[in-house]
Amino acid sequence: MARDAMGRTTECQDSILHYRKFGRIPEGYNLPMNLQEFFLKQKEAVRQRTRQVAGMVRPEQMSWRPEAGALSAGQLLRHIWVSEQGARKAALEGDLSYYETRIPKGLGAVLGQVGTVEEELANLERVHGETLEAARAFPLERWDEERIHEGLNIRRKVCVILLGINEHEIHHRAQLMTYLRILGAPVPEAIRRR
């Protein structure tokens, strides 16, 4: 796939130019950003919102779940960082051991014991920092490499796995916010203003 000096595909360039021509994208909007830079910027923006929601969880809410069999609030916090760590290792190190356990044995096999709110929030930050550092150091020309595990029927590009980390976090952040709203938490001010 052809890429320009910024790492953008021809299709991506054409799309940006098309929308800018018709006035839908302001001049200069993300033009000097390659896929790696986009991921890093998006990752930080996603985490900023997650910090707002995760910071609302109180210790007495960690074990709450909406129904039997659902993840608890604490398990959701833990799942976000545990899965991010596993996905990052798969993408950037080619280590699919997280999925070798997770897929056949289920989430419980990789989740581990939930800690305190403070411990889970610290792990969210630790893993986030590790992901940013590793993604920043990973050469842009390798972002199209595939990670393959025939036994698990996995065939994904590095960039797809990494962008999936962000989508996964957004999904579970919304789930956690739903839990908190059920428990009577107010909508965070930053969200209410929108």
Where are these regions (language model features)?
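Hydrophobic alpha-helical core bundles mediating ligand binding, dimerization, or RNAP-core interactions
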Residues: K43, R47, A54, L124, ...
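Short, charged, low-complexity loops and linkers
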Residues: N30-K41, G112
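Acidic/histidine-rich alpha-helical segments that form the ligand environment
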Residues: G108-H149, R156-H171
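Short, Lys/Arg-enriched N-terminal segments with co-localized hydrophobic residues
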Residues: H18-P32
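Short, contiguous alpha-helical
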Residues: L40-R51, P59-G106, E146-R194
